[in-house]
Amino acid sequence: IASSSKMLVAGVLLSLQDDGLLDIDAPIADAVDWGSSNPEITPAHLLSNSSGLIGLFPDPGYGPYVCQFLPAGTLQDCAESIFTSPNDDGDITPPDVAFNYGGAQWQVAGAVAEAVSGKSWAELVNETYVQPCGVESLAFNNHFTQMGEGFNYPVEFNSDPSTLIATDNPNLEGGAYITAPDYGQLLLMHLRGGLCGDEQVLSQEALDTMHADRIAAAYDGSAGGAGTGYGMGWWIDRESGRISDAGAYGTVPWLDLEDGYGAYLVIEATSGEGNDLASQLYDIVDDAVNAG
């Protein structure tokens, strides 16, 4: 589901904050030994694409961060190499100065989650989402060098996780796979105060943190245009209030928090095609829901 993975990643870290294992506003140096290389960066910076590290664009293959796309090695080793690399020193900025979407900052976020919990990313996903919400299809891998061509849907996957090799270095910003009904369950969790059935997956405070326009509050930032904000894993349409987490392969999940509904558009194509179709559906879906 490519970048529709991001809200899932943010939720894992907010769950750890709910459990008292992580403070998303504290320097990650408090959580990992190698965090002192960039002592001002916090998990909140990472999850809002505001860490100052190099984002996914304009160069997805940015040399110092290339391990994010490789299934070899571990998430810990990859994140440490990213965070401590001297080869990005001329390119990075202080945190909360600019919005740099995606990229290796999400690997760092996942490694911090592993470190404070003492669990692997796979174990965290299982405990946070799979078990309480029954979303058995959800897992992460690192498919980018295994199949497909970057931002085009990897048709070789064919909805079969066995086509991927096992990895201890999943791609966090874009490596999740999940069926549409299971993703829908997680959207419902966001609309039901963090509940999956009787299980409290995330607190309402955690959800509010993810859904709020952090970049506006922190540094009067915008995400590609004055009308677009970003929370933690969620794009925010500042005019309508709609939040979304679209992916490169055509998935577009969105929530209307005011009206209390969500939708999940799934096509196996490109982000441009997915977003174009979603833009045609937003008002149609909204009118249908509000018509009762």
Annotate each language-model stretch with its function.
Residues 1-25, 106-114, 183, 260:
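Active-site SXXK
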Residues 2, 8, 45-48, 100, ...:
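Structural recognition of the beta-strand scaffold that forms the well-ordered cores
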Residues 13, 186-187, 285:
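Hydrophobic "lid"/C-terminal helical patch
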Residues 23-38:
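Short, glycine/proline-biased beta-turn/loop segments that scaffold the active-site neighborhood
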Residues 39-245:
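Short, surface-exposed loop or secondary-structure junction motifs
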Residues 175, 249-259:
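Short, surface-exposed beta-strand/loop micro-motifs that present aromatic residues
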Residues 215, 219, 272-292:
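Short, gly/Ser/Thr-rich active-site loops of penicillin-recognizing serine hydrolases
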